[in-house]
């Protein structure tokens, strides 16, 4: 056993590890009282995520409470947008709002190439401070939104139930949408490189809304741009593990495996055994406990964790939820999740 690198990083690289690493999407957030107290003092989400002292403090809150094996930057997938010339705000209980949705060629041509060091230096500062603080006790994770999901937000102007506006663009003006997606792919790759250079050891790409696409449209509007991001990042940072997550991914799981990422993060609607069977053996898996289960009993939580880890045996596996932890989740149950996750291999025993 080597302690020269964090457990989660070694697992993500496919090395033999002493136990299954565990972290949680959205592990810093509204379910924690310390976060809610801080939010009451700083009600602007953008201030909380763009002030480096606040972002660092929030990123560290779950580590100080639960000691997960990964500490993820507290930020948002839309954080790079202003650096490209797209302003946004995040309204509590309503979500993101884009002041001027991007729907014309002139708007797309006016977008700026992202220069993260100039437009969002707070991200680099926080990642560096996190690395310094956690050392080898946890891996530092960075993340981005994938091109399709970013496009969905900026074209729709807000969260959507049916994505009618961006789908209208996709099917009426596909060349226009491809120009936007290509701009995002280049900028997001630049942003990921910046995160890695600043201290991120593992990075995750969220294509949250790609599950709204048919498989054929996924192949046209999402997968090529996911792959473009991966190819660009891997060309300069080949040893940094990359994770891909899509909410509602059951219909495109095999396609996700062809994007060049190292790990596929499964949502809870895919059985872990089925997910492993549908993906090439060289790919790792992450997940995939239903976040709603954390409203249940400790016994139920432990049972599902054991089930997920047992079914992932033989693969490189990072234990996580199948989606972000939900607001209102009892903190004691989050603690059960982390404590069980760290002990799950002992609960299962040595049987494969």
Swiss-Prot record:
GO biological process, one term: protoporphyrinogen IX biosynthetic process
Major subcellular location class: cytoplasm
EC numbers, comma separated: 4.1.1.37
Site, Transition state stabilizer: residue positions: 76
EC class (word): lyase
Similarity annotation: Belongs to the uroporphyrinogen decarboxylase family.
Protein name stated in the entry: Uroporphyrinogen decarboxylase
Species whose genome carries this gene: Prochlorococcus marinus (strain MIT 9303)
Gene for this chain: hemE
């Amino acid at each position: 056993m080597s302690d020269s690198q964090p457990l989660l990083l070694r697992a993500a690289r496919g090395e033999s590890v002493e136990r299954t690493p565990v972290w949680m999407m959205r592990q810093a957030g509204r379910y924690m009282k310390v976060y809610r107290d801080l939010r009451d003092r700083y009600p602007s989400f953008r201030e909380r995520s763009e002030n480096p002292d606040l972002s660092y403090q929030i990123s560290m809150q779950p580590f100080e409470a639960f000691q997960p094996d990964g500490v993820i930057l507290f930020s948002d997938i839309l954080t790079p947008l202003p650096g490209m010339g797209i302003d946004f705000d995040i309204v509590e209980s309503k979500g993101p709002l884009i002041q001027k949705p991007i729907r014309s060629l002139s708007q797309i041509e006016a977008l700026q190439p992202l220069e993260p060091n100039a437009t969002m230096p707070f991200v680099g500062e926080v990642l560096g401070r996190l690395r310094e603080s956690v050392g080898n006790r946890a891996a530092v994770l960075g993340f981005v939104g994938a091109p399709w999901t970013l496009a969905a937000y900026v074209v729709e102007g807000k969260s959507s139930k049916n994505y009618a506006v961006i789908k209208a663009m996709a099917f009426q003006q596909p060349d226009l949408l491809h120009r936007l997606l290509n701009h995002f792919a280049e900028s997001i790759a630049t942003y990921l490189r910046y995160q890695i250079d600043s201290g991120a050891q593992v990075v995750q790409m969220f294509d949250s809304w790609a599950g709204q696409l048919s498989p054929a449209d996924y192949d046209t509007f999402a997968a090529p741009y996911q792959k473009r991001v991966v190819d660009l990042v891997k060309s300069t940072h080949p040893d940094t593990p990359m994770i891909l997550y899509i909410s509602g991914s059951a219909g495109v799981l095999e396609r996700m495996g062809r994007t060049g990422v190292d790990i596929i993060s499964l949502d809870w609607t895919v059985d872990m055994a089925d997910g492993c069977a549908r993906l090439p053996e060289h790919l790792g898996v992450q997940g995939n406990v239903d976040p709603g289960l954390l409203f249940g009993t400790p016994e139920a939580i432990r049972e599902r964790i054991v089930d997920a880890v047992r079914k992932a045996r033989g693969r490189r596996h990072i234990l996580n939820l199948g989606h972000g932890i939900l607001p209102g989740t009892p903190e004691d149950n989050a603690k059960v999740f982390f404590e069980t996750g760290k002990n799950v291999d002992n609960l299962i025993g040595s049987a494969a």
